[in-house]
Amino acid sequence: MVYGLTLLLLFAACGEDKPQPLSIQVVPAKQIGDTKGSEYANWDTVEFTGGGGVTYLVASEPLLTEWNIVACKIADGGSQTKIVAARLNAYGSKKMQEFSENTVNLKQPLGLKIGDRWANFNPLLNQVQDRIQLRGFTAAEAEQFQRDLADR
């Protein structure tokens, strides 16, 4: 009897609906007018309504995902947005260092995709070491992302 109740409680606990972890992607991007050549053939087109409605091409592979972030702090970004100051794992840090060491990539936009929403396309202004600021989170997204990191 006790064994049966234990199994029942275990199955009930496993059946709880937990919210899906928030997906984060940082992706190289270019304004569509700045893209010439076959290297952009596999990039996707994004109509970004923020910032005056600009069309971007974004790389098919992200530079970073939520799995490259090991810790974060949340700051107020103004205009009802939040900034996530993220510390990167070794793989993400190495990848961003290599990307940002190429001066051609500096001052070029990086697309930030949060879930299914393109949050912004801010330029990469400085070389990245092991930390990066991600702008454009809503308060709810920033809080959920912080919980997701704590639950890993």
Show which residues each predicted segment covers:
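Structural signature of multi-pass, alpha-helical inner-membrane proteins
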Residues: 14-152
